[in-house]
From Swiss-Prot:
Domain notes: Switch 1, switch 2 and the interswitch regions are characteristic of Rab GTPases and mediate the interactions with Rab downstream effectors. The switch regions undergo conformational changes upon nucleotide binding which drive interaction with specific sets of effector proteins, with most effectors only binding to GTP-bound Rab.
Lipidation (S-geranylgeranyl cysteine): 211-212
Ways its activity is controlled: Regulated by guanine nucleotide exchange factors (GEFs) which promote the exchange of bound GDP for free GTP. Regulated by GTPase activating proteins (GAPs) which increase the GTP hydrolysis activity. Inhibited by GDP dissociation inhibitors (GDIs).
Catalytic activity: GTP + H2O = GDP + phosphate + H(+)
UniProt-annotated stretches for the region Disordered: 183-204
Species in which this protein is naturally found: Mus musculus (Mouse)
Binding site for GTP: 31-33, 50, 76, 132-133, 135, 163
Any Pfam family matching the protein: Ras
Residues bearing PTM Phosphoserine: 29
Protein name: Ras-related protein Rab-17
Superkingdom field: Eukaryota
Binding sites annotated in the UniProt record for Mg(2+): 33, 50, 73
GO BP terms in the entry: anterograde dendritic transport; cilium assembly; endocytic recycling; establishment of melanosome localization; filopodium assembly; immunoglobulin transcytosis in epithelial cells mediated by polymeric immunoglobulin receptor; melanosome transport; protein transport
Source organism phylogeny: Eukaryota, Metazoa, Chordata, Craniata, Vertebrata
Cofactor dependence: Mg(2+)
Amino acid sequence: MAQAAGLPQASTASGQPYVSKLVLLGSSSVGKTSLALRYMKQDFSNVLPTVGCAFFTKVLDLGSSSLKLEIWDTAGQEKYQSVCHLYFRGANAALLVYDITRKDSFHKAQQWLEDLEKEFQPGEVVVMLVGNKTDLGEEREVTFQEGKEFAESKSLLFMETSAKLNYQVSEIFNTVAQELLQRAGDTGSSRPQEGEAVALNQEPPIRQRQCCAR
């Protein structure tokens, strides 16, 4: 049965940021944790596969409003897939991450989308398809056009990135955050509660059509 995620939640106290939950989904070793660590700590290193789920929090300051982003990094191994579905609950956004050098991971991202579609009503969740590891372009198995066309066919946001080179990592999370705030509506200035504040004073990258149709 589909569950209602609703819009990002705003605190009842005046001036508090919206709170949104974002889940990272994808096969093992596609770079979900690397993307999260690069975004949160500007750090890149070889990491062990995630067991269960890792959790990060960051407050994004847009000047007139702010958003507290709760980032849930889920395990990609098949044996954890049923557990990962538990982390869908209450999600407002999802990154479907694949490795551009592994066609199978692209297909797996499509399966994760099917799982999301079973859990949520259309338009309830902001979804971005993310092709990681553009630094390994010579080993590419999934073309940019393939990713773009699939995203367009499903009304998803789409970007390619490299956690290793820090290419478009911030843009991915910031674009999703801006989409979440747009949906929630700008209700005036907000004050971050906790976490690291990051200014989003740049124009978002060109995006595909609205993800998970409105």
